Amino acid sequence: MKKKLRPVAIYLPQFYPTPENDEWWGMGFTEWTNVAKARPRFVGHYQPHLPADLGFYDLRVAETRDLQAKMAQEYGISAFCYYHYWFNGKRILERPVEEILEAGKPDFPFMLCWANENWTRGWSNRPNDILLKQDYSLEDDKKHITYLLSVFNLNNS
């Protein structure tokens, strides 16, 4: 019996300002900062790729997340896979998922992908300058699993 593949969209939650990014990269930094400053590197290289339908959206806005889910369904996407950050109990860029958990919408399937690496200044060609370090311990693993269980017990995850 063949199972039908379900397309899942990777969802980077870096599209709203945070105090950490303000400190590390400058006031108001989001991933849009990098998108807008992209430049062509060779003939025929189209840059920057500016956003279309939703513009330079802000993931703090619930209507944006609702529209993204609607667009995803229209284009045959079956779920979102949100990048999830956990640094010894510190979560960052968690607001979109937390607001979805609280509000129960958009009513669209999702999963989490643990972005399990140090945050560094690699963009600035300083990969050894660690901003947030990944450390591992049994105690922290248990806390992380407990948090994840609260997410996985929802109907749409």
Identify the residue ranges that each predicted region occupies.
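Glycan-processing catalytic domains of CAZymes
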Residues: 1-157
